[in-house]
């Protein structure tokens, strides 16, 4: 093989389809838009959800619920994620963000009981599940709601 014999991989270089260049191309005259009608016009297309004037599905279905403006979203941390800290560490929300366990604090941190804890830690968080609090205390650590 020589440099002038190099060719791109099959299918990696797709040729752009040029429309309106004669009937023989298969996309001449109307350029693949069919005859007349709204979708044949320039800029002419229907918005998403439009059903030709029929009452659209999203308006036929009843409204449900509301958005609680006071909703709090907690960053979730499981017990097995706390194993990355050394024995005797005081785990705070700031430390969890700094070490990359959670991206951001959100409205607070909630510790859940998935996995097992192998270290003795003092954990400070906004909320604890019952199983998480029990597991932390069982290892001789402490949990504190802040």
Curated annotation (Swiss-Prot):
Coiled coil: none annotated. Residues 1-13 have a biased composition (Basic and acidic residues). Residues 23-35 have a biased composition (Gly residues). Residues 1-56 are annotated as: Disordered. It comes from the Bacteria. Binds to the 23S rRNA. This is Large ribosomal subunit protein uL15. It comes from Staphylococcus saprophyticus subsp. saprophyticus (strain ATCC 15305 / DSM 20229 / NCIMB 8711 / NCTC 7292 / S-41). The gene is rplO.
